[in-house]
């Protein structure tokens, strides 16, 4: 049920991003080849150069352009040209794996949560401000060999008096058991967030020796 709710929500977000224009993200090159992801799992040297294919949606809602980026090892740099550079707002960013299977059902895993992001004037990049608010450290995609997982990225406008819901505190721990069963719909309701302002997703296919990413497809 949660997967269906999220799929519907993300489908709506793609239409929102179409109205606003291009929504794009890229990834910084990792400084070293030492690969331990945010969950403390050794990934292996060949996964350091996973390729991300992301798309640009035209006014008709169709995927019009494919570009190649690299390195999903670390948290993404979010470039949102669709948002006004004069906006005084702060933003929240999430990355969620929506294809985790547990006990025969699909559940979600929180890979990243970052509050207090603001839009840089010249670059349109969402950058972190000095803040006492905790985030959920980034955990790189590493699906089991032979399985294909979708990773959804969502950006919300942060309310002026934003308070992190106490019932979700355990999701901030950097372990897989703590991050399982995250529900973005319930979080948005508890935190009194509005609709997302931007979203994207990519698909990762896990293999025994490396992780290769597939071309983005429309929902």
From Swiss-Prot:
Coiled coil: none
Transmembrane segments: none
Summary of the protein's practical applications: Phomoidrides A and B (also known as CP-225,917 and CP-263,114) are potent inhibitors of Ras farnesyltransferase and squalene synthase. CP-225,917 and CP-263,114 inhibit Ras farnesyl transferase from rat brain with IC(50) values of 6 uM and 20 uoM, respectively. CP-225,917 inhibits squalene synthase with an IC(50) value of 43 uM and CP-263,114 with an IC(50) of 160 uM.
Pfam families reported for this sequence: PBP
Biological role stated in the UniProt entry: Phosphatidylethanolamine-binding protein; part of the gene cluster that mediates the biosynthesis of the antihypercholesterolemic agents phomoidrides which are dimeric anhydrides. Within the pathway, phiN is not essential for dimerization and its function has still to be determined. The pathway begins with the highly reducing polyketide synthase phiA that catalyzes the formation of a C12-fatty acyl-ACP, starting from one acetate and 5 malonate units. The hydrolase phiM is involved in the release of the C12-fatty acyl chain from phiA.
Similarity comment: Belongs to the tstN family.
Name of the molecule in the record: Phomoidride biosynthesis cluster protein N
Species: Fungal sp. (strain ATCC 74256)
Gene: phiN
């Amino acid at each position: 049920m949660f997967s269906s709710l999220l799929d519907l929500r993300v489908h709506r977000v793609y239409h929102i991003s179409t109205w606003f224009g291009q929504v794009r993200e890229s990834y910084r090159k990792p400084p070293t080849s030492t690969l331990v992801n945010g969950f403390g799992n050794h990934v292996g040297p060949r996964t350091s150069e996973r390729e991300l294919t992301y798309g640009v949606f035209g006014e008709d809602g169709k995927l019009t352009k494919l570009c190649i980026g690299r390195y999903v090892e670390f948290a993404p740099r979010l470039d949102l040209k669709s948002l006004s550079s004069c906006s005084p707002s702060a933003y929240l960013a999430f990355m969620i794996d929506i294809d985790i299977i547990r006990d025969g059902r699909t559940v979600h895993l929180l890979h990243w949560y970052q509050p207090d992001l603001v839009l840089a004037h010249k670059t349109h990049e969402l950058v972190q401000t000095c803040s006492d608010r905790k985030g959920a450290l980034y955990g790189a995609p590493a699906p089991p060999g032979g399985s294909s997982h979708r990773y959804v990225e969502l950006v919300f406008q942060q309310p002026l008096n934003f308070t992190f819901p106490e019932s979700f505190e355990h999701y901030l721990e950097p372990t897989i058991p703590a991050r399982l069963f995250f529900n973005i719909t319930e979080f948005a309701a508890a935190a009194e967030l509005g609709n997302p302002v931007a979203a994207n997703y990519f698909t990762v296919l896990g293999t025994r020796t490396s992780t290769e990413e597939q071309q983005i497809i429309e929902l």
